[in-house]
Curated annotation (Swiss-Prot):
Origin: domain of life: Eukaryota
Name of this protein: Required for respiratory growth protein 9, mitochondrial
Biological role stated in the UniProt entry: Required for respiratory activity and maintenance and expression of the mitochondrial genome.
Gene: RRG9
Primary site of residence: mitochondrion
Subcellular location: Mitochondrion
Keyword Transit peptide: yes
Keywords: Mitochondrion, Transit peptide
Keyword Electron transport: no
Listed Basic residues bias regions: 291-301
Amino acid sequence: MSSQPLTAANIFAVLRHLRSLCHPTRPVTTASFASSIASQIIPSQAYNNYTSTHYTPLSIPKNGALKQLHFVASYSTAPPAKTEKVTAEDTSLSKSTKPKPKKPLPAWAVQKNALKEKFKEGWKPRKKVSPDTMESIRKLHSMDSVKFSTKNLAEEFKISPEAIRRILKSKWRATEAEEIDRRNRWEKRKIRIQEQMMELGLRHTDPTSKGDPSAEEVLSQRHYSSNSIEDLSGEYPSQNRRREGIPQKRIVPEDNSSRRFDPWEVTADDLLGTKRDYAGDNCAKEDSSKVRRSSTQRHPRRIEYNERSYKEKPDW
């Protein structure tokens, strides 16, 4: 086959033929494609010396339909079709833009959100509530839940309804040791507040000289009163039971075995209704009067009791 190179004169004819091949009306074969190109190529004198050994004709396998379509598409001048690529970000945005059904919030959640926007600290109240106050809140609510509702208790104690709701919901109770420690801490806080008030001139009493009982004394009194109430059946506690907490004075009998017996010793029983005028008795009376004077100065009520009869009771 002679050499028939492409020149500027016949390039438009080749391109026109390739464009017509993009939309063929009849099946295109390899032989017809090569013959059509060879018929439209005009030989040039400049390339006559080009031998046929250097020319390799274009060949497409007969059974390669996919390769033929790829060859036609590579020589076509039509612009390629644009394919829209959907990225992962677009899918995530499309999913997030879907409106979700909103559930109605409870009243406490609405109030919590409103407080968070206004005070930037949520429902947390500024006021500290003592453990005794919390216990009284629970007691009032258990007595009458309608009268002492969450709203009424919040208005009464000046705290938020959410705090009241959490206090009523909590079931934790402190042990006796924890309660003692808590009361001691509250006692220290009370003393600190009193000292601050004294510095400001709002209080004139000394907080250290407090007459309030300590936490241990309060708990012991509560324990004693609860036990006495449980034991009583409509009667007052016995005298011995009431004097359990009072320290009693131990009476130790005198040991008179070592003393010598004096037959002339006079007791108070011997002096009742008798009169003796001898000198020894007068001296003893003078000494006894001095002792009585000193004892009257110490114990004035004892003399009043001695002057009366033994059956009467004093007026103190």
